[in-house]
Amino acid sequence: MKLVIVSGRSGSGKSVALRVLEDLGYYCVDNLPLPLIGSLLEQLKGSNDLVAISVDVRNLPEQDKVLVKQLASLPEGTELTSFFLNSSDKVLLKRYSETRRLHPLSKSRVSLQEAIKLEGKLLEPLSQQMDHYIDTSNLNIYELSDQVRQILLGSVDKELVINFESFGFKHGMPTEADFMFDVRFLPNPHWEPELRPLTGLDEPVAEFLNRQPLVNKFIWQIENLLETWLPHLERNNRSYLTIAIGCTGGQHRSVYVAEQLAKRFSNGKHKVNARHRELNHAKA
């Protein structure tokens, strides 16, 4: 089992680091009480081999000793990596002023500036126990994400999952699509009596559509568009990209086009999924 502990001052980027870990498949728990680390790992044993927890000032004071004790008693075979994120007082003050969020220690009559300084003092012992110290003062969220991935994977490369989804316009448009293409102008197998009961997954329908120059040209143009912009989308720190293909009923044309695109992109470095909304609904 791999355990990652993320700690640091409020506003330094712990939530960004946790999102990166979540994208990498980690089961993430924010601000877990330190005495519960052992029981959490025990519960997840066998079902989740990647676990990440965040530890912040709300777990303190004096629980740094508890953390040492908990880490010393981790289950055998647990691979531990820990991060401490920090920023200068000036940067933290600016971030809190911009977001207008309440600092965890901004209670009673303690000013924001005093709360930031107090938190730094309280977390100092904990920061010295962490494996990796990252100063995020001059980092944006993408640069911080890259640093976390670099430490964990030895590379900043991020696997982008591409989902091709077919649907029927008469059943409503999908809300989660990043790109949407309307293929209702393509030749329709529905008007061929022998093809009407079939779907775009069936060979006779695939052969019919493959004979249509317009279909092949449109697929090629979508493929070319996506290949042109995928590198830029990846640099934008995306985890998923959903391309929706719609025809009238979501049975023939959209299914075929989505399948063809999925096959073409499966030959590359990305993880690719093809799903067919209306066909899945028909099975349910």
Swiss-Prot record:
Keywords of this protein's UniProt record, alphabetized? ATP-binding, GTP-binding, Nucleotide-binding
Locate the residues binding ATP: G8, R9, S10, G11, S12, G13, K14, S15
- GO MF entries: ATP binding; GTP binding
InterPro entries per the UniProt record, alphabetical: P-loop_NTPase, RapZ-like, RapZ-like_N, RapZ_C
Please tell me where GTP binds in this chain: D56, V57, R58, N59
Protein family according to the UniProt entry: Belongs to the RapZ-like family.
Q: What does this protein do?
A: Displays ATPase and GTPase activities.
Q: What name is this protein filed under?
A: Nucleotide-binding protein Shewmr7_3352
Source organism per entry reads Shewanella sp. (strain MR-7)
